[in-house]
Amino acid sequence: MKHFEANFDGLVGPTHNYAGLSFGNVASLNNAAATSSPKDAAKQGIKKAKALADLGLVQGMFAPQERPDLHTLRRIGFTGSDAEVLNKAAKEAPALLRACCSASSMWTANAATVSPSADTHDGKLHFTPANLVDKLHRSIEPVTTGNILQATFNDSRYFKHHQHLPEHTSFGDEGAANHTRLCSEYGHAGIELFVYGQEATNPSAPKPQKFPARQTLEASQAIARLHQLDDDNTVYMQQNPDVIDQGVFHNDVIAVGNQNVLFYHEQAFLNTQAKLEEIKRKFGESPLHFVEVPTAKVAIQDAVKSYLFNTQVVTLPSGEMAIIAPTNCQENPAVHAYLNELVTLGSPIKQVHYFDVKQSMQNGGGPACLRLRVAMNQDEVAAVNQNTMMNDALFARLNQWVDKHYRDRLSVADLADPQLVIESRTALDELTQIMKLGSVYQFQR
């Protein structure tokens, strides 16, 4: 049977804006209050997803969340019509309004953690939406994320869906951005790497001092239990607290893995050598490639600014691996020089493809943030909601949909415009029909 690693990218929502909501994310903070282009952002994401499909990869799309989130604004005491709720929130609590208008669900690397059927006791593909409790604007996502996942992977013979973890910082969970999987082949049992920032129940354990550690060891262990993983195919690694304090808010900003390659910065982890030995031991005899980028070649600051590690490492139908990088990597001399060298180093990575995702990058999310990886066999791929899979027809339909519903420009002040609610709901209602999702949104229920 054939096996694939599919990428599911998040469609950028109609309220894409730069509100600087993500403390610890340097790009997000640096671009706060800039004017965004929801239309450009959505089209950049759709174009990137189509390009990967054209490379021969299995590519799907996730719908965005309903924003502005009037349900949450009402839950915290704002009353009246939709227009009155927005007006009151804009006057009395503008920061809360901004949080309820974020299009951050486009970064589907944070949507969930996924364990393929080759790794799990029951032989099913497991999904757990991330609770994202560290950031208010993301903590309101998990219920709708679960609805969208279930509408996309809706065959219970193959797919097992879990509720997100308890909404407490002890179980802070940021999804696949802190999880990667190493394997000899996508269909073989692999090693699932869970990377955490701190131990919630051990105050004396190392943790960052300046920026928050968003993922806890306790959350990672809970996911592994839910997904029915063995100790023999799980490794827990702590991210270096010093790099978190330098703006590496998720592990996918400093490391990325694919099949038998782990591509990471020299400073990415604590106890690196011991953990690499554990991975080798559990991985077995098959070839395994650790590609370590030394600080002398790429400083942490350059890695964060360019998002060198927030690239996608993908296996092409030819068997060669390619890096899908943002154009920012081309524009950074040290990073560009390193990538040119990387393809000559003898690892399976032989190609680099550059994509313009600047609207996402300015809010702190590169190519890897925009996708959730799902390793599947051909029966599982066939069981996915096919209306979510990228092809020529969906590409054309989504571009037409964006042209019809999205604004060219959006400022933070525009978030209080009642017309934006109507535009957004009209767009999402039509999208659920295009992608055959059913009633996944609060306003449809």
Swiss-Prot record:
SUPFAM superfamilies this protein is in?
Pentein
Gene3D superfamilies under this entry? Succinylarginine dihydrolase (3.75.10.20)
Q: Name one GO molecular function term.
A: N-succinylarginine dihydrolase activity
> To which pathway does this protein belong?
Amino-acid degradation; L-arginine degradation via AST pathway; L-glutamate and succinate from L-arginine: step 2/5
The record places the active site at E174, H250, C369
Keyword Transferase among UniProt keywords: no
Family, similarity comment: Belongs to the succinylarginine dihydrolase family.
Protein name (database record):
N-succinylarginine dihydrolase
Point out the gene that encodes the protein: astB
